[in-house]
Regions:
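Extended alpha-helical scaffolding segments
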Residues: 2-246
Length: 246
């Protein structure tokens, strides 16, 4: 109020009025994205996420499967979609040079209103490249009966008490998603939750090991003098004392 952003004596909620035509356009579009039959939305803990590209793209088709739990009638669906997504640059289906605009919007209930939890915009190529880096960071040796790839849902349930999403810290799911899209270090809360579950359950699963490996590599990657990155298998050439001590 009474700031340099006020215009034409309009204050607070009336500072940026929009036309009826604009209101009708964005509410119609949002209702369509949030509709019951929409494939451009998914639920992330307490946040509804909607996404779209300026024109139909492969990323738009598989984006939901990368971040959600697999369908009950097809538990391997997510793994298949992620595998195709990671191979897409080599098949020419989806490449990192695609300049098609891509958007992600996170909405959360707030009293009687809806609040914007996060907003991301970039190109299909940028989002695809950052998501592939995320999966590369998570690579680890697994047994034959384990899934080849971990969706965001798999990661979050592995660090949650009783493997239930509702037991996670409020902002972890959205913070982790944004770190993936921006190709930034994972939130510290992810590491803390992972260590807590390992200590409580006395069980280091391959997913939890992958989370800690990826967290450390992403954390130190942008340092001026980063240490040698942790590999997906035992590195016999690594002489770092902390690494040798486990």
């Amino acid at each position: 109020k009474k700031s340099g952003y006020d215009s034409y004596y309009k204050e607070q909620g009336m500072n940026a009025p929009i036309s009826k035509e604009a209101e009708a356009a964005y509410t119609t579009a949002l209702n369509s994205l949030l509709g019951k039959d929409s494939s451009n939305k998914y639920r992330l803990h307490d946040t509804s996420v909607v996404f779209w590209s300026q024109k139909p793209t492969k990323l738009e088709q598989c984006f939901c499967f990368i971040f959600t739990s697999p369908p009950k009638d097809d538990p391997d669906k997510n793994t298949e979609v992620i595998r195709d997504f990671l191979k897409s640059p080599f098949s020419g289906v989806l490449n990192d040079e695609d300049k098609t605009p891509f958007y992600v919007l996170g909405l959360s209930p707030n009293a009687a209103r809806i609040s914007v939890r996060f907003w991301r915009q970039g190109t299909v190529g940028e989002f695809a490249s950052h998501i592939r880096q995320h999966f590369k960071d998570l690579e680890i040796i697994k047994s034959k009966n384990q899934r080849a790839y971990f969706s965001l849902f798999n990661l979050l349930t592995q660090v949650a008490s009783l493997n239930k999403m509702e037991n996670l810290p409020p902002c972890l799911a959205s913070d982790l998603s944004q770190s993936i899209w921006d190709n930034q270090p994972y939130p510290t809360t992810l590491q803390m939750q992972c260590l807590i579950r390992i200590k409580a359950d006395r069980n280091i699963t391959s997913i939890r090991a992958a989370i800690l490996k990826a967290y450390l590599n992403r954390k130190f990657r942008n340092h001026n003098n980063p240490p040698k990155e942790i590999q997906m298998a035992l590195d016999l050439e690594n002489k770092n004392q902390a690494y040798l001590c486990g």
